[in-house]
């Protein structure tokens, strides 16, 4: 039997940009696809996700990307608003049907822990790396999408695995109390993103409340 080719499930506008990325030698060799949309479209298929995030471990010149995006805009008839925020070049695209799409190209100087998939010659961040990034993110910001993503990722990895991943990847220690406090922020959420698999807000809140208690009690026992 032949090897099953990895699949990616994107909206038509996301697929259009992904197809342009894979045609560019510069982009497909310099960047990898990551973030919530990579997580949902390649691995978990658990929720709708809007943005396309492409990261590079090396610093890069944004001018070639700006020029490419301008070419794509002419070819596919979308308007572009572009700005730079720290180390990320952000493109806000508006298509003729008024649908909008945000595409980011960012410098992310952290070596990936595992090799991810390759789809149509585009590198995809690994499931473990995305999970480690999510754990590192939730104690810095309070976005329900990150907590939903981590909810499903914690069905596949233990929090201890991810804590060790954060230590290796970011050279930082996340202690159990910090993570427990981050988990409890889920109590403030009022709604969920559009889900593709069953999950309700009460389940999400109870999940993190229970995890926070277990994590705290495990530290006390030690």
Regions found by a protein language model. Name each.
Residues 1-222:
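Compositionally biased terminal segments of proteins
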